[in-house]
Amino acid sequence: MILQKRVAGVSERGLERFVLRARRAAGVQGRVNVLVTGSAAVRSLNRGFRSHDKATDVLSFPSALPAAGSHAGSLLAGEIAISADIAVQNAMRLGHSVAEEIKILTLHGMLHLAGFDHERDNGQMARKEEKLRRALRLPAALIERAGRAQEPRVQPRKRRMA
């Protein structure tokens, strides 16, 4: 666990405990490293690995390599990078704590490490994310929020006066 950017209400110990719970819930085998950093660092990672020159809230990097210094058979499942800056903005906009937002982003990244891909799986990751965030007692997760933002807003019809 690396907290490069300190965030009020978020401790390494608390995040480590949540990562273990989320890893088990998502069925991820192996160790997961989580980096909480600033938007500039996440933008650099996004540009370097995905050719997207912009900051984003969370990135996941699956790995099948043995963890450094580990016993044979111990694998590094992958790494998750979270923008603390975007987490703070999201939490303020959505009315929940930054700690909850970082947990939501961690869960989303964990599901990517488990092999889910919301861009290609016809809603499978969205259903799993909703189920797990409810079990982990978290506010609405990323895919749910994106779905709500894309839903067409139906205007109520005006009644005609007779």
Regions found by a protein language model. Give the residues of each.
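An acidic/histidine-cluster motif and surrounding catalytic segment
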Residues: 1-100, 111-162
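Conserved SAM/SAH cofactor-binding pocket of Class I
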Residues: 104-105
